[in-house]
């Protein structure tokens, strides 16, 4: 947990009574569906817009963290849906002094002949307002009549917090995470394992022990890109059940590598629980994987499941964190600038319920792990 973060119990107290206002009917624990024992909760919101999921998962090292995580995910999804008060306008890209849509990495077939819908965003690095395509802000996204859609909308960079600064930091960590993951996925390597056996972090040791006791092999992989912000994947292989649908992973990013590892481990536990939970309602992904078979799925994803090319210890990963969200934001912006990423935008999506939510956009960061149709310069220059 970030040193400046509000305790999860306080977050639950502050925002819990607002869940009914956004249509959440219940938050339920699904930890028991799996045998790992790492807390996972699920929030159900039947009123979610068409094109968006209505069940959200939450993770954490404690039950309180996991419950708060599921709750905040629900507020994020609600806030990302278009609302009547959202001020947007339409214009052809050539007639708008806004962000170049191409910098968002468009699918190869995109033709910018039609008008786009725009919304003003704040530039964290320059203080001025800049119009950005609304397609990169709202989820789900349905363009107004006469306007085109640029790509399938997603939730990358959508984040909440107890305060706006915290939400911006979380959103920034997510877009950096997806970029690092995209680069690894597109290159299919190199696999560098993170050895945590010597860690004195009791939370990490406890999480790893839970997987070990359940007979689930977990490998931690260093995905950190040139941005220098620690990004770690936790890759789980259930050697007891040998169920291909349970070949799962989680990814975590933070200036503090220990927090990145904790996020990755809790997320892979969440991936397992939601996969087990989800297969009871939606069998498409699980059925595909089960038809392919356990060994074949591991071969198809050998860049995750093969022997590592190198190993580092957790202590070798650089800790860039400060004691404040503001300090962490400043360091992150500096690291992005050093990688040639000058602009960081955010749109404040805080709604009438008062839970701080933003969408963070960093033009140039890769999104291949979210949308394989979109391949940018960073991937092309690294392959």
From Swiss-Prot:
NCBIfam families xrefs: methan_mark_1 (TIGR03266), YcaO-type kinase domain (TIGR00702)
Coiled coil regions in record: none
Organism: Methanothermobacter thermautotrophicus (strain ATCC 29096 / DSM 1053 / JCM 10044 / NBRC 100330 / Delta H) (Methanobacterium thermoautotrophicum)
Domain YcaO: 58-383
PROSITE patterns: YCAO
One Pfam family this sequence matches: YcaO
Protein name: Uncharacterized protein MTH_987
Region spans: Disordered: 80-100
Gene3D superfamilies per record: 3.30.1330.230
């Amino acid at each position: 947990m970030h040193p400046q973060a509000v305790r999860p119990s306080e977050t639950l107290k502050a925002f819990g009574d607002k869940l009914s206002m956004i249509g959440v009917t219940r938050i339920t624990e699904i930890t028991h569906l799996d045998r790992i024992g790492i807390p996972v909760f699920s929030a159900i919101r039947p009123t979610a817009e068409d094109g968006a999921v209505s069940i959200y998962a939450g993770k954490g090292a404690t039950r309180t963290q996991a419950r708060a995580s599921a709750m905040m995910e629900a507020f994020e999804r609600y806030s990302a849906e278009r609302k009547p008060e959202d001020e947007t306008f339409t214009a052809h890209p050539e007639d708008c002094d806004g962000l170049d849509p191409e910098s968002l990495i468009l699918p190869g077939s995109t033709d910018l002949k039609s008008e786009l819908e725009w919304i003003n965003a704040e530039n964290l690095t320059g203080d001025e307002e800049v119009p950005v395509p609304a397609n990169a802000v709202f989820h789900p996204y349905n363009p107004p009549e006469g306007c085109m859609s640029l790509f399938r909308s997603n939730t990358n960079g959508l984040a909440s917090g107890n305060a706006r600064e915290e939400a911006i930091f979380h959103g920034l960590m997510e877009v950096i995470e997806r970029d690092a993951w995209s680069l690894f996925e597109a290159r299919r390597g190199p696999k560098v394992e993170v050895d945590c056996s010597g860690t004195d972090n009791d939370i990490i040791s406890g999480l790893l022990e839970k997987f070990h006791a359940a007979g689930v092999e977990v490998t931690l992989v260093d995905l950190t890109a040139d941005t220098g912000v620690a990004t770690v994947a936790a890759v789980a292989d259930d050697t007891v059940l040998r169920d291909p649908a349970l070949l799962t992973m989680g990814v975590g990013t933070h200036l503090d590598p220990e927090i990145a590892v904790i996020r990755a481990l809790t997320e892979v536990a969440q991936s397992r629980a939601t996969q087990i939970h989800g297969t009871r309602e939606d069998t498409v992904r699980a059925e595909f994987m089960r038809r392919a078979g356990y060994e074949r799925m591991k071969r198809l994803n050998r860049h995750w499941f093969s022997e590592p090319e190198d190993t580092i210890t957790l202590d070798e990963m650089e800790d860039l964190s400060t004691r404040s969200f503001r300090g962490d934001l400043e360091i992150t912006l500096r690291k992005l600038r050093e990688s040639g990423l000058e602009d960081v935008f955010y749109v404040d999506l805080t709604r009438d319920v008062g839970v701080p939510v933003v969408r963070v956009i960093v033009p140039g960061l890769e999104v291949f792990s979210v949308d394989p149709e979109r391949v940018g310069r960073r991937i092309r220059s690294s392959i």
